[in-house]
């Protein structure tokens, strides 16, 4: 089906992204996978190419473009290239809105220029060893000491945790307040008592550094509070729809790409004296996946447009995240199966797509949490 949501400007941007991937990412990606981390030079290159801070106002060095379709193009092309390790979506679409929407003028001038050049890499630290989806379980504290915050606690599974120069930390500022006693406080590289643990060894997305973070009596200036004190819960809920849309966009793009490479494979691979594509079972498998992808694509494109226009609600963002990522997981499994033993070999793209994509139904809100949000809203 012909997609109708992109203009010539979006198409030109897509070509820019593809050129960037070809020149600056793919030649180095295998080394990054071995190293378990992307080079900082790649971030600087992304900044020079104008791929960072797409929605940041021009006065702070950004693109000044809040059209989410550009972010969708970026997510689609990085997914198709099999290069999720350079986490531009995390930087642009998850942390970016907190800085542009909540930061004071002084904070914007301090942080946003580096955000857009790639000199300042960002992360957000919510998850803790004992608190994932349950924000009320957060134990990291930020004690008001008059002229500074004193932060103690730990975080885990933090994307960009090793590289990050600026970490948005979710911490308790009113311990008895539960989820409504949380605040967002920015901790910068070099803060005394702020330590990074090991770069965690994951089954996929190995070049995307994921770390434990530790805070031992970390003194943070009072002016590093982001947004309202005790306002983190509302701030997080406001921005989660965009995070989930970014994940959903990558999910359907991955499913479509897996279907594409598997369709090519079954046409070329022979068994029992003929191409696999001549077997009825194979044709049924391809037909089912193609139909599921087409239906999901139609829904996702509608959600992309709605989000670009500011009309997408949390329920439909949750539907998109749940459905697209679960589809990605199913398609990855079926496509690997159709590759037979070759699908289990790391040199085949389907193998890496299988392991890289498995996290999609977990981070940004698990499938189970998405269903809870949808069901709770419909039955309220």
Regions found by a protein language model. Name each.
Residues 1-85, 102-107, 114-119, 134-135, ...:
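Alpha-helical interface subdomain recognition
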Residues 65-66, 134-136, 160-164, 178-181, ...:
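Short glycine/proline-enriched turns and hinge-like loops at secondary-structure junctions
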Residues 88-90, 115, 130-133, 157-160, ...:
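Short Gly/Pro-enriched turn/cap motifs at secondary-structure boundaries
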Residues 93-102:
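Helix-loop "lid/cap" segments that line or gate small-molecule binding pockets
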Residues 118-126, 170:
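A short, Trp-centered hydrophobic/proline-enriched beta-strand micro-motif
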Residues 137, 190-221:
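Flexible, small-/acidic-enriched active-site or ligand-binding loops
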Residues 148, 152-196:
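A short core secondary-structure module
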Residues 213-235:
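Long, acidic (Asp/Glu-rich), low-complexity accessory segments flanking structured domains
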């Amino acid at each position: 089906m012909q997609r109708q949501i992109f203009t010539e400007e979006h198409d030109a941007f897509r070509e820019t992204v593809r050129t960037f991937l070809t020149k600056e990412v793919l030649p180095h990606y295998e080394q990054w996978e071995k190293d378990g981390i992307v080079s900082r030079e790649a971030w600087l290159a992304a900044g020079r190419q104008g791929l960072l801070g797409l929605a940041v106002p021009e006065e702070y060095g950004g693109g000044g473009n809040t059209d989410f379709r550009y972010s969708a193009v970026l997510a689609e092309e990085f997914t198709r290239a099999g290069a999720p390790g350079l986490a531009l979506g995390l930087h642009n679409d998850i942390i970016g809105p907190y800085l542009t929407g909540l930061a004071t003028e002084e904070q914007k001038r301090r942080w946003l220029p580096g955000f857009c050049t790639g000199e300042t890499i960002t992360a957000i630290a919510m998850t803790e060893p004992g608190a994932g989806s349950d924000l009320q379980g957060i134990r990291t504290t930020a004690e008001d000491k008059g002229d500074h915050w004193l932060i103690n606690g730990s975080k885990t599974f933090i994307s960009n945790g090793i590289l990050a120069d600026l970490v948005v930390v979710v911490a308790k500022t009113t311990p008895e307040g539960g989820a409504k006693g949380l605040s967002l406080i920015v901790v910068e590289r070099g803060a005394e008592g702020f330590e990074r643990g090991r770069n965690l060894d994951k089954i996929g997305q190995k070049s995307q550094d994921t770390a434990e973070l530790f805070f031992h009596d970390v003194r943070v200036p009072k002016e590093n509070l982001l947004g309202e004190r005790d306002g983190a819960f509302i701030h997080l809920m406001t921005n989660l729809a965009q995070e989930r849309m970014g994940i959903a966009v990558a999910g359907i793009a991955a499913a479509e790409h897996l279907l594409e490479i598997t369709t090519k494979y079954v046409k070329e691979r022979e068994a029992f004296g003929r191409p696999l594509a001549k077997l009825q079972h194979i044709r049924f498998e391809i037909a089912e996946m193609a139909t599921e992808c087409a239906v999901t694509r139609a829904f996702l494109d509608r959600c992309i447009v709605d989000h670009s226009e500011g009309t997408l609600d949390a329920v439909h963002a949750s539907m998109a995240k749940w459905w697209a990522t679960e589809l990605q997981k199913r398609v990855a499994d079926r496509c690997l199966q159709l590759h037979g033993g070759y699908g289990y070999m790391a040199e085949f793209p389907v193998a890496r797509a299988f392991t890289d994509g498995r996290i999609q139904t977990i981070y940004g809100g698990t499938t189970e949490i998405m269903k809870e949000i949808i069901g709770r809203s419909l039955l309220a």
